[in-house]
Curated annotation (Swiss-Prot):
Disulfide bonds: none annotated. It comes from Ralstonia nicotianae (strain ATCC BAA-1114 / GMI1000) (Ralstonia solanacearum). Keywords: Cell inner membrane, Cell membrane, Membrane, Plasmid, Transmembrane, Transmembrane helix. It is a multi-pass membrane protein. This is UPF0060 membrane protein RSp1275. The chain crosses the membrane at residues 8-28, 33-53, 63-83, 90-110.
Length: 110
């Protein structure tokens, strides 16, 4: 069960970061309302707070988080941007998630 909690927390953290970066991108690249910067800032603050909830050292958290970020970013690419994922996208995400699992699920010293 702990593994699922860690994976969910990584996915939620990645989503908060992606939303926090995507909204300013809409403002700057697609001339959307500057009001989108407010929820973007809140989302990035949520992202920073969520990072503090991870149960391991910050550097290890960031390293493991990167794998989940890749997978969530590709899901965003498919769902929000409507792009078709390639086998290279899927294979790369699988490799990144395997790396995340090695780092995040390593035995903890007693």
């Amino acid at each position: 069960m702990e593994y699922l909690r860690i994976a969910f927390l990584f996915a939620l953290t990645a989503l908060a970061e992606i939303v926090g970066c995507y909204l300013p991108w809409l403002v700057l690249r697609q001339a959307k309302s500057a009001w989108l910067l407010m929820p973007a800032a809140l989302s990035l603050a949520l992202f920073a707070w969520l990072l503090t909830l991870h149960p391991t050292a910050a550097g290890r958290t960031y390293a493991a988080y990167g794998g989940m970020y890749i997978a969530v970013a590709l899901a965003w690419l498919r769902v929000v941007d409507g792009a078709t994922l390639t086998r290279w996208d899927i294979g790369g995400a699988a490799i990144a998630l395997a790396g995340m699992a090695v780092i995040a699920l390593q035995p903890q010293p007693t």
